[in-house]
Amino acid sequence: MSDLPPDLVEDILSRVPATSLKRLRFTCKQWNSLFKNRRFTEKHFCKAPKQSHVLLWKDYTVCPMSINLNFSGSSIEFKSVLSLKDSHYNSEQVYIAKVFHCDGLLLCTTKDHRLLVWNPCLGETRWINFENDYKPYSRFSLGYKNNKSCRSYKILRFWTSYLTPNHIGLRYNIYEFTTDSWRVLIDKVSLNYFLIESENGVSFKGNTYWLALDEETNFLLGFDFTMERFKRLCLPSNKNCDTMVLSVVREEKLSVSHQNFCSSKMDIWMTNRIDSETAMSWKRYFSVEFKILSMCHSLPFCNSFLIDEEKKIVISTVRGNENMVNIIGAYNAYYAEVPVESTNWPCSPYFVSYVPSLVQIQQCKSKENNKTSLEM
């Protein structure tokens, strides 16, 4: 390829999946320099195939998984835990309490209440400063503002606060990577809904979405990082008695599982467009049945799930069962349980749909050399 014009080489490499291109990074100086070129990484993000990988959070760690889906016998291979070491603390292991994925970046809340952004593919990290203002039970999400030339990443942080002794409200902050600082977005907003997911929500096309509940109905709550405002959207079902969980498919589709307490069926709904607050098109992609379970077993309600579109299979972690992954197929009432190594933490493990990317973590100029060492 050394005889090809540089523009053509760049165009070819921009179509190579991130994990494959990473192996070619040090083939020559020209290719290595592309990894530091933001224009190229933006081009690669738009053109390269999205290869979805499965990560499992459990016991304060993130573990890659390989899932073999076969109706004659499915299996799961758990690979080595991704090692994240902190050079600020004698290269000690970083224990991750929560993880949120956006564009190949992992926003991690640590066990000792710190916050960092991590690109496992590139081995880059950036610690986020709280300025001694950490709030217990804060929720965090990562998204971006859509610019013409590139994406500008931000972090949303919100937590509950008492407006009066008997009245609870919410407070919202936005973190800007360029200034390494937080600013107040909304202060002391009256709380008239509740988030009904135990997870942190999901990222879809740069925005974050959660399942929420008010006095009358379930709905989808979205945060637009470009406009910096919340929006309320419809769900396939809005009954308060139903159980729903959000997921994403290769960062291209938003998916929701729907279970009714009175039914043995789980419906999988999907959409690839969210145009406005009033119009949103959900399509029921397939359904799975739990008829194979005996009457003495309660239905397994999932707290996270992934789907295989081609085989129409749901892979889920189960509420209240820290040591099991369920695999349910739409055909022939297929059902299997795959054990997970025992956990020492009383929270159910959950899946993270991870798509490796070359997205660079924007470093504040004053802290460009203050990076955490990473081992994978």
UniProtKB/Swiss-Prot annotation:
Q: List the disulfide bonds.
A: none
The F-box domain is annotated at: 1-44
PROSITE patterns reported in the protein's UniProt record: FBOX
Gene3D superfamilies given in the database record: 1.20.1280.50
**Source organism superkingdom:** Eukaryota
Q: What SUPFAM superfamilies does this protein's entry cite?
A: F-box domain
| InterPro entries the record matches | F-box-assoc_dom_typ1, F-box-assoc_interact_dom, F-box-like_dom_sf, F-box_dom, SCF_F-box_component
Q: What is this protein called?
A: Putative F-box only protein 9
Q: Which species does this protein come from? A: Arabidopsis thaliana (Mouse-ear cress)
